[in-house]
């Protein structure tokens, strides 16, 4: 995976700094929610924002605009990156796909199994099986960058590559398992929007306004269809042309223009809106409930075990190789960091249980504690026990 290092060097630095900003926004949300401004914080998130065109009306709380709208842009960027890597990047070589794919697969299966084992027999709680399968890449990358120069750049790229498959897994989980009542009419409109983008792509049309209009129609129709609106983001990305008829980079230009807004606006706002756990309402007894224990074990134990085990098996049976210049100890350290589920786990938690206080916020606290433990232990392990050989 050598040639991808230089290509993503700037992205690594930006996402690392963005990760620090996420930490600040998380702490700020906790302080505001548990301080004298808690009422204003909740009013801000519940503020109704919307528009109407004729009989059509879309009116939702600001929190849902963030979780359904802004986060769709994040998945759109993931889709652009995925397409770029498969067509012209390292993923064009199937051998480079195996390690991050297997790592992501292990990081989904093992945490989900642990959560299910702890909560077997409780149908409602089992709805949250996907909560510990997620990784907050920006946070994990920020911690990895803090570990210093003795961590090979190839491991940073491995984490980014793993994140792509992890996010695709999250999209599939959301689309398949967390949907509500489906609307055929909305699906038809979504199909028309997709067909329009396909035609634009085939004709080589690279007017951004055309794709923007189609993507908005697709987003609204997917939102109304019952499938989570984030799916619209990655679908749109697949139809963005790689270049213009003159050979100028089109997809790359769009991707580069989004990076700043993702790192410094969208993801920090998402963290601020979702990390405000009301600690005063938490029932201490609920912390040791099945949902909390399942989330903690899934994130802190399941993620590192699953990612490392599946990675090791791929390497052991020669389907893949260790990232250049790294050793198994360092690889394991990165696997620990994948237990930082934070914003993505909170997001899936909201989809799974809808009523956020059903467990007296113990589920949210478990996500924060498990993510904190994964970050601290991962940093200590990489910094002091996994030095470069």
From Swiss-Prot:
It comes from the Bacteria. Signal peptide: none annotated. The chain crosses the membrane at residues 12-32, 62-82, 97-117, 128-148, 157-177, 184-204, 220-240, 260-280, 282-302, 331-351, 365-385. It holds the Pfam family Na_H_antiport_1. InterPro entries: Na/H_antiporter_dom_sf, NhaA. Keywords: Antiport, Cell inner membrane, Cell membrane, Ion transport, Membrane, Sodium, Sodium transport, Transmembrane, Transmembrane helix, Transport. PANTHER family: NA(+)_H(+) ANTIPORTER NHAA (PTHR30341:SF0), SODIUM ION/PROTON ANTIPORTER NHAA-RELATED (PTHR30341). This is Na(+)/H(+) antiporter NhaA 1. It comes from Campylobacter jejuni subsp. jejuni serotype O:6 (strain 81116 / NCTC 11828).
């Amino acid at each position: 995976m050598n040639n991808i290092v230089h290509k993503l060097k700037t992205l690594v630095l930006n996402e690392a700094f963005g990760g620090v900003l996420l930490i600040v926004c998380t702490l700020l949300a906790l302080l505001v929610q548990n301080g004298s401004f808690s009422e204003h914080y909740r009013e801000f998130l519940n503020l109704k924002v919307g528009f109407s065109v004729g009989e059509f009306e879309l009116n939702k709380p600001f929190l849902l605009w963030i979780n359904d709208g802004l986060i769709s842009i994040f998945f759109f960027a993931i889709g652009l990156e995925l397409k770029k890597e498969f067509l012209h990047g390292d993923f064009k070589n199937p051998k480079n796909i195996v390690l991050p794919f297997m790592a992501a697969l292990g990081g989904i299966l093992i945490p989900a199994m642990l959560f299910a084992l702890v909560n077997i027999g409780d149908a409602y709680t089992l709805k949250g099986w996907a909560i510990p399968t997620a990784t907050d890449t920006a946070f994990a990358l920020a911690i990895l960058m803090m570990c210093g120069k003795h961590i090979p750049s190839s491991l940073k790229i491995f984490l980014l590559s793993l994140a792509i498959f992890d996010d695709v897994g999250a999209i599939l989980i959301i689309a398949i398992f967390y949907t509500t009542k489906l609307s055929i009419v909305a699906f038809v409109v979504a199909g028309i929007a997709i067909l329009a983008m396909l035609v634009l792509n085939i004709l080589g049309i690279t007017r951004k306004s055309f794709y923007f209009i189609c993507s908005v129609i697709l987003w609204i129709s997917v939102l109304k269809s019952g499938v989570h609106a984030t799916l619209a983001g990655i679908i749109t990305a697949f139809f963005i042309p790689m270049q213009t008829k003159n050979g100028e980079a089109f997809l790359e230009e769009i991707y580069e223009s989004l990076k700043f807004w993702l790192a410094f606006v969208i993801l920090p706002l998402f963290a601020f809106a979702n990390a405000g756990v009301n600690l005063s309402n938490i029932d201490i007894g609920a912390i040791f409930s099945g949902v909390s224990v399942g989330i903690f074990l899934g994130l802190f134990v399941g993620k590192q075990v699953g990612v490392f085990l599946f990675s090791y098996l791929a390497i052991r049976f020669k389907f893949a190789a260790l990232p250049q210049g790294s050793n198994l100890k360092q690889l394991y350290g990165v696997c620990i960091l994948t237990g930082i589920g934070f914003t993505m786990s909170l997001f899936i938690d909201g989809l799974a249980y809808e009523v956020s206080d059903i467990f007296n916020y113990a589920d949210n606290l478990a996500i924060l504690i498990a993510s904190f433990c994964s970050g601290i232990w991962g940093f200590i392990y990489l910094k002091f026990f996994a030095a470069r050989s």
